[in-house]
């Protein structure tokens, strides 16, 4: 199956991946779909190419897992932006710093601007969650544009981040986005990541 280089909104990519594989009678764990979308971006031809390779790898198992992604595409299942937002959401300082330390050591594969963008989308969704009166999985999934699989996680995290705290986090992300571009600071990757996590979790 061949696609042109059409691009879609990044938050729609995991669903596109699931549907593409479903057409081949292959399922994918939601976390694995997120890992792929984070790593490959939103270029559908590029994504389709990698998924066609995975079709050969999974064989008769017919399921793509984070482990398969890690082994065959080279994305760490433990050190990625999905795991970082999860660690931050759960206020797991140790795990968050472990992940950004890995990012800083491999900053070409983990550009700071991508982490900022993903965290901004994550906290924007958490802000939206606070405005949703119907907290049923279906309603939250639709309002946030996330797989129902992740709804309970968002609801749990929202208790750690009330609206006022989220507003502060979003402002912090804007500040460090500017700093990463040399505005008001000239910090290396490690310092940027460490300062960012400190200011989000303080």
How would you label these PLM feature ranges?
Residues 1-202:
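Conserved beta/loop motifs at nucleotide-recognition and modification sites
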């Amino acid at each position: 199956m061949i696609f042109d280089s059409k691009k879609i909104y990044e938050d729609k990519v995991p669903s596109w991946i699931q549907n593409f594989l479903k057409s081949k009678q292959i399922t994918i764990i939601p976390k694995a779909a997120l890992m792929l979308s984070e790593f490959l971006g939103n270029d559908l031809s590029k994504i389709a190419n990698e998924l066609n390779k995975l079709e050969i790898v999974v064989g008769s198992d017919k399921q793509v897992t984070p482990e398969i992604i890690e082994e065959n595409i080279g994305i760490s299942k433990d050190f990625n932006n999905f795991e970082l937002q999860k660690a931050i959401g759960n206020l797991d300082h140790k795990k968050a710093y472990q992940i950004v330390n890995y990012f800083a050591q491999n900053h070409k594969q983990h550009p700071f601007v991508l982490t900022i963008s993903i965290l901004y989308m994550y906290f924007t969704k958490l802000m939206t969650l606070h405005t949703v009166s119907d907290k049923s999985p279906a309603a939250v999934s639709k309002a946030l544009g996330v797989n129902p699989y992740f709804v309970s996680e968002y609801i749990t995290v929202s208790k750690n981040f009330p609206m006022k705290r989220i507003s502060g986090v979003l402002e912090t992300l804007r500040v460090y986005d500017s700093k990463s571009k040399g505005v008001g600071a000239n910090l290396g990757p490690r310092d940027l990541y460490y300062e960012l996590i400190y200011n989000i979790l303080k």
